[in-house]
Amino acid sequence: MSAILSADDLNDFISPGVACIKPIETLPTQPGPEQSQQPQSLEFEVILDGQQPTTGSSSNGTTPPAQISLTDCLACSGCVTSAEAVLVSLQSHNEVLTLLDAAPALRVIQDSDGKPVVSGLENPEAKLFVASVSPQTRASLAAACGGAVTEQQAGWMIEQLLMGPAGLAGGGKHGNGFTWVVDTNTAREACLMLGSDEVLGGGSWGGSDKPTSPILTSSCPGWVCYAEKTHPYVLPHLSRVKSPQALMGTLLKTTLSRVLGIAPDRVWHLAVMPCFDKKLEASREELTDTAWGSGGVPGRGVRDVDCVITSKEILMLAASKGVDFFGLAKSAPVKQPMFPDSDIHRFLFPAQRRKQLRDGGTSGGNLHYIIQDVLSKHAGSQIQMTRGRNADVVEFAVLSSSGETIFKAARYYGFRNIQNLVRKLKPAKASRMPGGKPFGSARRPAGKSATLEHSYVEVMACPGGCTNGGGQIKVDDQVVIDRKNFGEKPGPDEQKAWQAEVDEAYFSGDESDPAQGAGDDQSMELIAGISPSYIRDTLAHWADITGIQLDKLVYTSYREVVSDVGKPISDTERVVQLAGKIGGGW
């Protein structure tokens, strides 16, 4: 028997969307002076909430607040997309401030030969601070600013906060700020090309474990968490390409550590994302230096992304330092310092920003890019789009000039629609009778499922996509109510209008800018504004300067998460668990 943890059971719980199956454990109290004189047993009793002690122990009626660590989340199969409820205390704006005040930051300077070197390494607590920011975060903050503030201008305001004198660098114990603030769009463009090659068998695909068709997007951590914990049969379908957050983290950690000759843990990477579940993604063992450590330099479990904060937490970060975020200048604070490698610098800080294409949606455009890649390979082909039961389910077909179907794909956003998707992918149960038909075959004949005919499905947990992520600023947040002068609590109509503002900000690139991406040249062949050849050359250069195989840098893996809750454990395992909790979880 194990108690089920829910909001009703705890007065300090943070209201998750689903019940967590971790049992509420109460650690044994420290023995008093009289008890300490008595022989001690090696047995300990874990008292579940609502249960009475089986021994003669007494309770004073007060129990410490229940705590659930990130380790608990990764070890059980209870929660799906409510990771924010248990991760706020582990990755937050307070952690950013704590690290910034821990020691003077490492500095990258030029030696007498003009080569980049790091100063300040004599202090073991010193870090080199670098941040990456998602376009959805910039869109959310731009909408909160109002006054036709663009996504790019909101990005400059974030740079002012993270690295400018009017922000974090203007105060604190050591006056530390972030050395670089990069745009995850550059990593996203690499992910788009890698994902298309994975689906269509293009030149960059080098993975040994190609996913099973239909290939499903894996850049949404809420969706991946749900699949690993509740529907492991879909794991062979998940794309092996890292998410933009993960790829950017690997790029920054590997390049800076290998080129500058410092340990990966001396580089501290902050990601600013629209989703609380990105905190969970950053904590995956597969996304640490254990996955890419090579060449006699084994990994030690150092995260590629050390901390994730959301769009909301950017405002909290500014407020905690007494900075009015909305009063920051809407221009770049300073020119970004030169990255230690010139080719990587050109990739991270392109001369021109590529405008977001509306046809690509608000979640990065994975499906749109793949379809454009298919169209580029078949002259005269065209797209046929069919809307599903709601706006978050759309099916696409690429038809040849003769009307023959060349490629089929779909988009599934929102948890309810995802449930329908995984239900269609569920394999039929084998019959226990010799020669009998598999269970479910009468209801779902083989080959009749439209979803199984798709080559690719773009899956996102949030309805409407990533601009509607759980970490985004919402219309009923006090900052929006104040800035919008709402007389009463916003309703569904205001929520819809607010989401439209965020989406509009996401697509608010300069109309005069060409649809070009990092390093694109007019002479290069472009797909959805991206040059695949330039991306491939950049990735090859990255692997070369770090001495790490490209497969280890750009691909990841997934595994079924099996719950141990309710299963018998040995005394040794129980003591180890208790010791871990007494020591603080992490």
From Swiss-Prot:
Task: Kindly list the GO molecular function terms attached to this UniProt entry.
Answer: 4 iron, 4 sulfur cluster binding; iron-sulfur cluster binding; metal ion binding
Task: Supply the SUPFAM superfamilies for this chain.
Answer: Fe-only hydrogenase
Q: Which InterPro entries match?
A: Cytosolic_Fe-S_CAF, Fe_hydrogenase, Fe_hydrogenase_lsu_C
Is Endoplasmic reticulum set as a keyword in this record?
no
Q: Which Gene3D superfamilies match?
A: 3.40.50.1780, Fe-only Hydrogenase (Larger Subunit), Chain L, domain 3
GO biological processes:
iron-sulfur cluster assembly
Checking PANTHER family in the record gives:
NITRATE, FORMATE, IRON DEHYDROGENASE (PTHR11615)
Q: Briefly, what is this protein's role?
A: Component of the cytosolic Fe/S protein assembly machinery. Required for maturation of extramitochondrial Fe/S proteins. May play a role in the transfer of pre-assembled Fe/S clusters to target apoproteins.
What is the name listed in the Swiss-Prot or TrEMBL entry for this protein?
Cytosolic Fe-S cluster assembly factor NAR1
What species is this protein from? Chaetomium globosum (strain ATCC 6205 / CBS 148.51 / DSM 1962 / NBRC 6347 / NRRL 1970)
